[in-house]
């Protein structure tokens, strides 16, 4: 091999190596982005697409709602009930705290977070009750309800569990239910499922990634 051929081959090898390195770097970057979430990544899931798929959902102000209403915001949706003693208030309080963390770190980010609460106890959770309940956490959070028969279909679509636990009287019952939240990106696509007890800091970190 003469000197010229050697140099040409060396240049080609260097170019190929550079391309391989670049592709590897891009792949690594994509992989890191995919595993950056602390919550469970359910991007592309064929469920939990919209809570109106099985019927009308009305917020505590009496307005019909869908995920599309909150385009441009990251939506965090939780299923619960107002007489829940621990899981529900803790989850909503953590979301409110996560929103404050985002706002503190970058002014305006807090306004891009929308908290939603769907009651699994429409018999007792009237619109006035739901509105008062949301006032305990954040004035922008919205609670929603639908008819009991429609709720069954909504829960099925979200793969969410709930069950009435009888009490001593007809009205003293409790509710057993899944403990976690669904998170949608600014385009209304479901992206994450956050487990109960993850904490405000972890939630804020995930929400920040979806705001980018």
Description of each model-found segment:
Residues 52-53, 75, 178-180:
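Short loop/turn microsegments at loop-to-beta-strand junctions
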Residues 131-178:
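Short, internal strand/loop/helix patches
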